[in-house]
């Protein structure tokens, strides 16, 4: 019976892809971002306030100012957009969208716990939560008023309890790595029972590759040991298997970079003379191009929907970089280097 959920039909895929196409058409274009790069912060907020973000800018404008207004409005819009995507989908598409968006459960857990550790007011954390995963906003609001021990206890009986139970005995960055490992591990347990599911799982595995190659390069640059690197990687990649990762982690950085050139994600990547953050943006661009190509190859599938989900998050990230950069007077060229614009 579960395989029937995965199969769906052409008409069902055509419907959700058509809805997604309309939503995708409303995303800001590269020329919009280049226009925004020539504006001052207040002009940027006014400009964004006339786009898809108007509702959130208007609603939160009385509560926040400056880049915090932008942050909260962007995350609120992201949550609303993803919830709408779930609402208009059904069958196989709804199942897969919801599974993928469980990533935001991890985001919310991390932000709530980090907020508790830093004594941030619950209402401030509340505004950056994205209730797009398995749990609804009511659940996250109940956690906001609990202490860390009670929050951890709330996840007893779930896969996330294991990494969360180590809070206090391990660094928070390791807890975060553990939470994302659980998220991907649970996704990879899905059975590739038909072509729709295989496309979804290949997408997930390729996303893991992108995360892992970033981790490899970042930790190598920090002179981490092979064991330290492996602790931070996520098993189950598309080409970067655990065995491959172990070999790469043990290589000197120059040799490792040479070895990486044969993998799918190294197409047109230029890293010479670049800082790690700039290299990570190169891989983000490769990932977006790859998703776009695969979505075009399989237009009646989950891939165009996943492409939109990724592009929407990239748009929000770009607007945050732009807003904070302009607010603090960074040169436009420096801000643009930190953005993912194709």
UniProtKB/Swiss-Prot annotation:
**Superkingdom as given in the UniProt entry:** Archaea
Q: Name one GO cellular component term.
A: proton-transporting V-type ATPase, V0 domain
Q: Name one GO molecular function term.
A: proton-transporting ATP synthase activity, rotational mechanism
Question: Alphabetically, which GO biological process terms does the record hold?
Answer: proton motive force-driven plasma membrane ATP synthesis
Under the heading SUPFAM superfamilies, the entry gives: V-type ATP synthase subunit C
Keyword terms of this UniProt record: ATP synthesis, Cell membrane, Hydrogen ion transport, Ion transport, Membrane, Transport
Q: Where is it predominantly found? A: membrane
Q: What's the protein's topology in the membrane? A: Peripheral membrane protein
Q: Where in the cell is it found?
A: Cell membrane
Q: Which HAMAP family match?
A: ATP_synth_C_arch
- Described purpose of this protein according to its UniProt entry: Component of the A-type ATP synthase that produces ATP from ADP in the presence of a proton gradient across the membrane.
Subunit-structure text: Has multiple subunits with at least A(3), B(3), C, D, E, F, H, I and proteolipid K(x).
Instruction: Please name the NCBIfam families in this protein's record.
Output: AhaC (TIGR02923), PRK01198.1-4 (NF002268)
Family, as annotated: Belongs to the V-ATPase V0D/AC39 subunit family.
Q: What is this protein called?
A: A-type ATP synthase subunit C
């Amino acid at each position: 019976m579960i395989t029937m959920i995965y199969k769906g039909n052409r008409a069902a895929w055509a419907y959700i892809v058509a809805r997604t196409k309309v939503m995708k058409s409303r995303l800001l274009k590269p020329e919009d971002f280049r226009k925004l790069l020539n504006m001052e912060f207040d002009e940027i907020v006014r400009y964004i306030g006339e786009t898809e973000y108007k509702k959130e800018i208007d609603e939160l404008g009385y509560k926040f100012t400056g880049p915090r207004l932008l942050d909260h409005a962007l995350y609120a819009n992201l949550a609303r957009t993803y919830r709408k995507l779930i609402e208009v989908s059904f069958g196989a598409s709804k199942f897969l969208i919801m599974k993928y968006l469980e990533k935001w459960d991890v985001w919310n857990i991390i932000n709530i716990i980090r907020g508790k550790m830093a004594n941030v007011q619950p209402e401030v954390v509340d505004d950056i939560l994205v209730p797009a995963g398995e749990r609804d906003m009511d659940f996250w609001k109940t956690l906001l008023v609990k202490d860390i021990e009670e929050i951890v206890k709330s996840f007893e009986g779930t896969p996330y309890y294991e990494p969360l139970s180590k809070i206090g005995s391990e660094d928070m960055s390791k807890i975060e790595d553990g939470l994302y490992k659980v998220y991907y591990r649970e996704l990879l347990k899905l059975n590739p029972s038909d072509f729709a599911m295989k496309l979804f799982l290949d997408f997930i595995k390729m996303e893991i590759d992108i995360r892992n190659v970033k981790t490899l390069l970042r930790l190598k640059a920090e002179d981490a040991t092979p064991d330290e690197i492996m602790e931070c990687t996520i098993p189950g990649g598309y080409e970067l298997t655990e065995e491959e990762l172990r070999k790469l982690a043990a290589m000197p950085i120059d040799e490792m970079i040479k070895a990486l050139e044969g993998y799918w994600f190294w197409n047109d990547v230029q890293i010479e003379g670049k800082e790690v953050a700039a290299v990570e943006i190169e891989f983000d661009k490769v990932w977006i191009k790859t998703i776009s190509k695969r979505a075009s190859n399989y237009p009646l599938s989950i891939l165009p929907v996943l492409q939109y989900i990724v592009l929407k998050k990239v748009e929000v990230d770009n607007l945050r970089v732009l807003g904070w950069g302009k607010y603090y007077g960074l040169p436009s060229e420096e801000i643009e280097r930190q953005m993912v614009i194709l």
